[in-house]
A protein has these predicted regions:
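Cytoplasmic-side transmembrane-helix entry/capping segments in multi-pass membrane proteins
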Residues: 106-113, 148, 172-180
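C-terminal transmembrane module of polytopic alpha-helical membrane proteins
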Residues: 1-21, 28-30, 189-262
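Short, motif-level signal for alpha-helix interfacial/capping segments enriched in acidic residues
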Residues: 57-63, 154-155, 183-187
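Alpha-helical transmembrane bundle and helix-membrane interface signal
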Residues: 100-101, 161-173, 221-227
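Membrane-interface micro-motifs in multi-pass membrane enzymes
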Residues: 140-163, 205
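Membrane-embedded catalytic cores of phosphoryl/pyrophosphoryl-handling enzymes
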Residues: 169, 175-186, 195
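Small-residue faces within membrane-embedded alpha-helices
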Residues: 115-119, 153, 157, 183
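N-terminal TM1-TM2 helical hairpin plus the immediately adjacent luminal interfacial "cap"
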Residues: 17-145, 191-218
Length: 262
């Protein structure tokens, strides 16, 4: 990380420093991944499928398995090692700086809030047809796994806290601001959410994590603006009432007080 002409740039630091919360999450995720691999190897695909149905996020069953919006964050796809590697690398690269700014407890609260929130957004959207009497869609029985919802929430936090930070994005030869990177990712995720990306990636969870993180971090500004709007409305309302009162009593002679009250 360095400063040049007043612009902060961000380069991957290979000091391999791992903050406490990041260390906990890395160990937990890799431990669960190893357990998944061993279960698949020694018990076969049916047992692994049961694991995903129980602890992955299955929208049609989450009402009975209330732990799923939490546990799905620790499961990753065995079909590609890059799923967990990219998630954990991004967590380490960006999450440790957030933890240094926020502290361990606040960082963990934010991580799980965005991860669980992303899962709930996924559940609500996929179960929406059932609420309108159209039945439960087939996609509501497919388990969603991975920490990507929380990871995207972390990226949003970095874009809000460090908007001008310069990051290199492969394969682009020039660095982009953190805000620009997240905006581009939001556009891609939005298009993928509405079926414009033919893959098995849960773009909906990614978008949900970004949305929850943005709303949470911007809630102070929103509440401040809302409070000011209410105060302005009350002020103008009282001003109108005062003008009406003056209009009614303008011709009344002033009364002499018999005594003063302090």
């Amino acid at each position: 990380m360095y400063s040049r002409s007043g612009i902060k740039s961000y380069r991957v630091s290979f000091d391999f420093y791992v903050s406490p919360a990041i260390k906990f999450l890395l160990i937990a995720n890799f431990a669960v991944f190893i357990f998944e691999a061993l279960l698949y190897r020694f018990s076969g695909p049916p047992a692994y499928g049961e694991l995903l149905q129980w602890f992955g996020l299955v929208p049609a069953r989450v009402i009975l398995y209330l732990w799923q919006p939490f546990t799905y964050l620790f499961l990753h796809d065995l079909g590609s090692i890059w799923h967990i590697l990219m998630n954990m690398f991004t967590l380490w690269m960006f999450g440790r700086e957030l933890e240094l700014v926020w502290g361990r407890n606040r960082f963990l609260r934010y991580y799980f809030m965005t991860g669980v929130g992303a899962g709930l957004v996924n559940v609500i959207v996929k179960m929406a047809p059932a609420l309108f009497g159209q039945g439960i869609p087939r996609t509501a029985y497919i388990p969603t796994i991975g920490a990507s919802g929380a990871i995207f929430g972390i990226l949003v936090a970095c874009a809000i806290l460090f908007p001008g930070r310069r990051v290199y994005v492969f394969p682009l030869p020039v660095p982009l601001s953190m805000r620009t990177v997240v905006i581009l990712m939001t556009v891609v995720t939005f298009l993928g959410t509405f079926g414009l990306g033919a893959d098995n990636i849960s773009h909906l969870c990614h978008l949900g994590g970004m949305l929850v993180g943005f709303v949470y971090l911007r809630r102070g500004s929103f509440l401040y603006s809302l409070r000011n709007s209410v105060s302005d409305w009350q002020y103008h309302r009282n001003q109108r009432r005062f003008k009406i009162y003056l209009g009614k009593h303008r011709k009344d002679p002033p009364s002499r007080p018999d005594n003063w009250v302090n």
